[in-house]
Structures are given as C-alpha cells and as structure tokens.
From Swiss-Prot:
Organism: Aspergillus oryzae (strain ATCC 42149 / RIB 40) (Yellow koji mold)
Source species, domain of life: Eukaryota
Protein name: ATP-dependent RNA helicase dbp4
Region (Disordered), start-end ranges: 1-28, 500-533, 556-575, 662-796
Motif segment (Q motif): 45-73
GO biological processes: rRNA processing
Disulfide bonds: none
SMART domains xrefs: DEXDc (SM00487), DUF4217 (SM01178), HELICc (SM00490)
Signal peptide region: none
Note on domains (UniProt): The Q motif is unique to and characteristic of the DEAD box family of RNA helicases and controls ATP binding and hydrolysis.
Pfam families listed in its UniProt record: CTE_SPB4 (PF13959), DEAD (PF00270), Helicase_C (PF00271)
Chain intervals with Basic residues compositional bias: 697-706
Amino acid sequence: MAPSNGPRSGKNAKSSHTLKRKRAQDDLSTLTQRVEDLDIKETYKSFSDLPLSEPTASGLASSHFKTLTDIQSRAIGHALKGRDILGAAKTGSGKTLAFLIPVLENLYRKQWSEHDGLGALILSPTRELAIQIFEVLRKIGRYHTFSAGLIIGGKSLKEEQERLGRMNILVCTPGRMLQHLDQTAMFDVFNLQMLVLDEADRILDMGFQKTVDAIVGHLPKERQTLLFSATQTKKVSDLARLSLQDPEYVAVHETASSATPSTLQQHYVVTPLSQKLDVLWSFIRSNLKAKTIVFLSSGKQVRFVYESFRHLQPGIPLMHLHGRQKQGGRLDITAKFSQAKHAVLFSTDITARGLDFPAVDWVIQMDCPEDADTYIHRVGRTARYERDGRAVLFLDPSEESGMLKRLEQKKVPIERINIKANKQQSIRDQLQNMCFKDPELKYLGQKAFISYVKSVYVQKDKEVFKLKELKLEDFASSLGLPGAPRIKFIKGDDTKERKNASRATAYLSSDDDSDEGGEKKSKKDEKQVRTKYDRMFERRNQDVLADHYSKLINDDGTLVDPSKTASAADDADEDDDFLSVKRRFDAGDEDLGGNSEEELEQKGVKVVQLDGKDTLVIDSKRREKLLKSKKKLLKFKGKGTKLIYDDEGNAHELYEMEDEEDFKARGDAKEQQARFLAEETERTRTADMEDKEVAKQKRREKKEKRKARERELLAEEEAEEAVAQLAPYKEDDEFSASDREDDAPRPSKKQKVRIAEPEESKEEPWYKKSKKPAAKAPEQIQTLEDLESLATGLLG
C-alpha cells in the first residue's frame, strides 16, 4: 500500500521543525567560523571562494555575478570581519557590490529581523545613484528575508513615514534622511550596525557638510562605517566627523600609472568660448550612430542647449537631465537613455557619479570641470567594466595650462586634438533667428549666459578659471543674443563713477597719486571689501557737500585754480589734512543765518519764492529736481493757518494767544483760577438741570403716546358695526366756525376706512383674555336645520 500524503502528526511536525532549526544554527555557526578564519591577505578570484551565506550566493548566481573585481576581492574580506573601510577604485570597477555584500552578510549572521529595527543605512549623493544601488540590492538580496526601502526626495513623505519603521536596510539621499530623522516620530536608529557612504568625497564636501553632520549626530557611535569612491578623501577632519575606528584604506589603483581605466581614450580640444556650440553641433552631426553624454555646468545651460538643438533637428534623439526636473521625469529620462542605442544626453553633474549607463561611446565635457576629481567622475560614465570608451574635453585658451597641470597631478593621460576647419559648421545665424522669433528661447539664452559666468566666477581655482580673460560679448553673440546681459556680481570699471567724476577731481587725484619724480602710478590700489555696516556708518546727510567738492572751493567760495594748487601741493606738509574743513559757510558782517536774496543773485545762485514767507535757494541739481515735485516742496513751505469768524464777522485764528499784560490786569492768577472754576461749576450745574428737564419731558411724551395707542386699540375692538367715513353733505358747509371749534381736533393722518367684523369671527385681544377657561356660550338657532341638529344631539 502506498504511503499516505496527508498531514504529519503533531509529534513528527515538531521534530522536523526542531531539526530544521538545529540545522540552521549549525550552518550559521559554520559560516561565522569561516569568516573568522578568512585570510585577508590572500587574493580571491570568484564569489564562491568567499564565506557567503546561501541566500547571498544564490542571489549573486541568479544575477550572473561570478568573478570578483580587484576592489571587491580586497574590500569584502575586511568588511566581513567588521572593520571600517576607506575604499578607492577607478570608475566602473564594481564598488557597489563591495559594500552591498557585507551589508547582507553581517545582518544575516546576526539573524536580523524586522523587530530589530534599522540595521544598515546607505547614503548616496544623488537620487539616480540611490535608485541604482537599490535595484542592485534587490537583485542580489532576493532570497533574503530583510525588508529594504528607498528614501529619496520627490516622493510622498507620509507614505514613507508609514513604512519606515519596518525597514532593515535603507538606501537614501542625505536631505530626505535628515528630514525623516527630525520629523518621523516612530523612526529609531539606536540599533544601527552599518553606515555606508557611496561617493564619500562628494557627500563629505561643503555641499552636504551640515546635513551629514546632523545625520551622524543621530546615529550610535558603535557601528561599522564603509566609505567608497573613485577619488577617496584622507582628510583627518572628515574621518573624525564619522567616528571611524582604525579604518582600513583599500586603494586598488593607487600605484597605477593612470587614475582612469586603460580602455578609455582621452582627448581635449582648445576652442574659444564663442565657438563651443558650433563644435558641439558639428560633433553630434558627425556621430549620429553613437551614444553620447554632454556635461554642462548648470541646469540653465542644459535647457538652452537642449531646446536649441531640438529645434535644429540633428537627426538623433536628444534628452536632457538636471536637478530642477520632477522625480518622475528624471526616472523616465534615465530609463530611456539606458535603453537607447543611439542618443545624446545633455546633463549636469547629477549623472557624473556612480550611474551605470550601458554602452556609452562618448563623454563630452563642454564646460571645464571644477577640479580633476570631477573630470575623473565624468569620464567614468564610459569605458566601464573593461569596455572601450572615448572622452573629449572642451577648453578655452585661458583654461588650457591650468587644467592640464591639475590633470597631470592626478595621473590623467590626455592628448590634444585639432578640429578640421572644413568639418565645422556654424549655427550662430540659426540661433539668432530662433531667439528673435521665440522670446522664451531668448530668455533661456540670457539665463544660460548668466549661469555660466556665475559658475566661472564662484570657482576657487583662479589659475584655471580666469573670468576677465573670457570674451563674454562674443559668447553672448554665439548664443544668439543681441548683447551680453548685465551681471551684477562682476567687478570692473564702474561706469557711473567715471561718468560723475569731474575733470578737476580727476586732475587733483592724478596729482595726489604722483610720486616725487612726477611719475604717476599706473594702477590704483584695489578697494577693500565694504560691508553693509561700513556703508551704514559712512552714510551722511544729502545736504552735506562731498569732500572732493569742498577741496575745490576757497574760503571765499570761489573755485580753486588748478595751477596754483599744483604748486602749493609741492610745498605742503604731509600732515596738512589733519584738521581739514568739512564744509565752508559764507559768513559776512551780517548774521550767520545766510545772505540776502540780492547777494545770492549776484553770485549766480537762483532763489525761488515759495507760497508764504519761505524762500528756496537752488544751489545744486538736486534742488532743481526738487522744484518738479510738489510733494517734496511741502516741507519747505510754512504750515497752513485756520481762521474762524465770530458773530460779528471778524476773522480770528483758531488758537489766539492772550497778551501777558491783559492777563495780569485781570488780577492774581490764583484768583482767576478760583473764579474760572466757580463759573464753570455754575455753568455745568445749569446745563445739567436743563438736561434733566429735557429728559423728563421726553419720558412724559413717550408715556402719553403709549396710552393713546392703547385707547385707539380698545376703541377699534369695541366697535360692533362696520363704519365707513364718507364725504360730508353740502349742508355741512353751512356749519358755523364756532361749531367747528367745538368739534374734536382733526387727526394728523387720514383715517383709514375700517369695516367691523361679525362677532362670530372676532377674537378677543391678548390683554383682555382671562386666565380662567371661559364658559361655552350657547349657539344661536337661525335656521330649521340648526334646530333639527340641536334636537338630535339632545336625544342621542
């Protein structure tokens, strides 16, 4: 008889679970022992040689990962033993697996579950790189029971908060992670085991410094920290911020002759700034069957170049990617470019680090990178995993020498190539035509120009970035703009100062700057930086003349002769300016208040008579402009006066001051005070009595009106018949006047015609109703039917 396939008995099931648990414990202890016995100095070639758990090994095999790269072979062993690591390797060398495998293995050996909380935190500088790391984690960790999450900006914060407490592994960007640490109440990181920083040098620089410091402040100090990047930092301050404990520095290609992959061909082109767009267009037209990434320094440039080339239709799909786009759009563009065989992607540095776009043929750097590390990360988007790739760098003649020195220091081999003149196509006329027809494109061009100049201006390496040597007018023309937009932050010759400077001032300043031999200084001293507080303390009233003007006039108000000034300056002592006159007033024999109008007119000064007694002296252009504004002239006019008229029609001012003699003639001040108080007391008492009498009369009239209304209501209710007032007969006209006087007074209003209602339908007014129930009145019998109904009721 065949064995039964039914459910096992309780005893057999319990024993099988016990055996399974025991077997798992034995496997875990064996794995732990293998990790402890691992020889770090030995070089391993495949993942099967490493002490990995069964779920991790199965995930690697399913994802077709078999052979170890150099960084993986040297870093995974240290990480499995729980040491802190600083990992540095070339781009495309497999650094992602070098930290994801230790994360899975360390949590697996500790039998981590969702009840233990967050076990590993992986920080990435960009959203796209975080998404890529999360996808790799899903592939190799598909057989594990850990819960992993992706925390980036652009997603719903509330949905992330609901699921965050159940996560064991988190891949995130610094900004969003700090937001959850500060705002999510149920999110705890006290039990964190591992902290991983991918592209650590970028995360630790000034852009993320405060954010990373705040995140590290929330984390426990007893943890394992892994730092990986193509250009690793060794600064003691950065390592101290992360509380690294005796870190192991793993640099695979430190002794290599090149910091970039050997399969990468690197070239640079020296082209003026105004010809970069023409060279880029010619390159794209010559490589329509290639996959290219073009790096620019700002998002405004990316948008302008993308929109311009899209209108020109080069014959290849164009895409653009920058940080101002929505997260959904960024993901779509990343996926489309990864799947495309032939395309051009215009991008900022958000795609320069870590992203793995398959089969990229060219990397074009239209703008010079800020340093050699940025250059290495940009060109690392091609020639990945031992594949071929090519990179081209566009340099302005002023940037060539400085940038080549920086690349040489980083062991970057690069060669110069020249462009054939017959292959280059100019698109300047087309861009000018498009900017003329499309105001939005012109606006984008202006913003692109400003953002590029600003990006050059803020660079620290002034040996490479020399803003004054760039031909900005030609660059603006190459963008299709009619002229270079004004940029406020560029320091140069102040046109306003040169416009307002007078010849005499320039002559005096030239004499002051000349040395004893008579030779003038060729260059003025650079001005020191003046803050807003300096300007606040240097501020003076507008009616005080400037120092240079006070030096041009003599004590008598006449202008200084320049020839005499030059000769006198030679004999003057250096300390003559110790007690210098700030402003001179023309004081004569009269009062110091000012000169008469005749004297001012003789000196050529214009005097304007305003409404009233005041006069306005026009001695400057500011005063001339003042005459055009009525509002500003009000402060120079006298205050208006208000007149009142007495009963006799005489005009008096609103407030007239009494003469002191008249006041004394009326007696002592205290007697006047007492008399005034008595008069005012009597006046107020009389007025109070009058007010009380008026109030009493009003109350009496109100009471009489109320009683009259009540009488009228009673008279209307007692009326038994319908009464209509009709016009009088002719005989009534014969009544005598005496009879009319005896009649009742005529009402003020015309009486309305009222018809009395029958008694059956009349209701008793509310004030006449009794609280006791009224007896029912007998019904009146009017017809035979009423009599019959009454008899029927009595009999029945």
